[in-house]
Every structure is written in structure tokens, then in C-alpha cells.
From Swiss-Prot:
It comes from Aquifex aeolicus (strain VF5). Its cofactor is FMN. GO terms for molecular function: FMN binding; oxidoreductase activity, acting on the CH-NH group of donors, NAD or NADP as acceptor. Gene3D superfamilies: Electron Transport, Fmn-binding Protein, Chain A. Coiled coil: none annotated. Keywords: Flavoprotein, FMN. This is Uncharacterized protein aq_928. The keyword Flavoprotein applies.
Length: 196
């Protein structure tokens, strides 16, 4: 099948793109508003775009009412955020933070997560996350209806148990989760791994 983009409706394009560009890592972004309200939200339009220094990218849509999501507003206001990685142990809590809450709601409390003080940014890390990247805003780029945010990592926090003495990642201990299309996710460990 072929789909001419200009002749294909938005719902179909959304379904195709999200179902075909897989698996996608999940950036679980924690921010703080200028008024001190904590926020967490997961994004699967996410990846790393540079390694030295590390630069991460998230792409965020608007709310259904076409207003900015809290993550975008907070990042543009404070110029900083933390990208936490999702592992199997926190998967259910991540799903809670993916629900749309009013700006005054603290998602840490809603999901039963612990804010952990960051070293270089005001936004807290998620203590339960095995990996966190403290980021300062590198660049903001609007792309059609999306808000693309690039963050330069200032610090990478990694749980000791997932790295060996040579700093290789043990995926059986990390147990990362990725996003597929629809309501499907994938475990990026165990028999799913292919070694070449």
C-alpha cells in the first residue's frame, strides 16, 4: 500500500506513523513551573540527537483545547527539565503520569513517585527512575503543530546496578520499556534482544 500524505487524513497518518516508527524510547520528563508546581509527563516522540555533549529531543503536541501542555510551558519558562527513562518497575506509574491533569496538579503525588533533588537544575529527578538526564534548554523549534525541545544534558544519573565495571549497560537489570503503536508497549530486554 502507498499513502500520499497530502491525500491522507490526519487520523490515518497518526495511526500509521506511530504504528510503523517503532519501537520508540520514552522520555519521562519532569519539570517545575515558575510557581513551583511539579509536573511529570511521558513522551515517545523522543530520542538522543548528539553524544558529546549529550543532547536529547522531545516533541510535544498541544492539549486537546490547543493550549500548551505543562511540560512545554514549564520548559519555556524555566529553560530546564529532567528526562527520566522508563523501566519495567515504574511502568504503571508512568501510565498515570500520561493522563491529562490540570496545571495545578502535582503528578509526583498522583503517581506515588518521589521527587529527588537535581544537582544542576531546579526540576527534580524521579527517584524511582534508574536513569535521569538533567538538561538545560538548548533549542526550541516549532514544527507545524508540535513543540520540539532540545535539551543539553548537564548530568546523567545512572543506578549503579545497571552498569558493569566497563560501564556497559546490563539490560536485564535496566529493563527499559519502549512504545509501539496504539496502546502497546515493548520490553527492550530478555529474549527481545538481538545480538550481532
Amino acid at each position: 500500500m502507498e499513502f500520499v500524505v497530502k491525500e491522507t487524513d490526519g487520523d490515518t497518518l497518526y495511526k500509521l506513523v506511530l504504528g510503523l516508527v517503532v519501537p520508540r524510547p520514552i522520555g519521562w520528563v519532569s519539570t517545575i513551573s515558575k510557581d513551583g508546581i511539579l509536573n511529570i509527563a511521558p513522551f515517545s516522540f523522543f530520542n538522543v540527537v548528539n553524544d558529546e555533549p549529550p543532547v536529547l529531543m522531545i516533541s510535544v503536541s498541544n492539549r486537546d483545547d490547543n493550549t500548551l501542555k505543562d511540560t512545554v510551558k514549564n520548559v519555556l519558562d524555566t529553560k530546564e527539565f529532567v528526562v527520566n527513562m522508563v523501566s519495567e518497575e515504574v511502568f504503571e506509574k508512568m501510565l498515570i503520569t500520561g493522563e491529562e491533569f490540570p496545571p495545578e496538579v502535582n503528578e509526583f503525588e498522583k503517581a506515588g513517585l518521589t521527587p529527588e533533588t537535581s544537582k544542576f537544575v531546579k526540576a527534580p529527578r524521579i527517584k524511582e527512575a534508574k536513569v535521569s538526564f538533567e538538561c538545560k534548554l538548548y533549542k526550541y523549534v516549532p514544527v507545524y503543530d508540535m513543540h520540539v525541545i532540545f535539551g543539553e544534558a548537564l548530568l546523567i544519573k545512572v543506578e549503579d546496578t545497571i552498569l558493569d565495571e566497563n560501564l556497559n549497560v546490563n539490560y536485564e537489570k535496566y529493563r527499559p520499556i519502549g512504545r509501539l503503536g496504539g496502546k502497546y508497549y515493548v520490553k527492550a530486554f530478555g529474549e527481545c534482544k538481538l545480538k550481532v
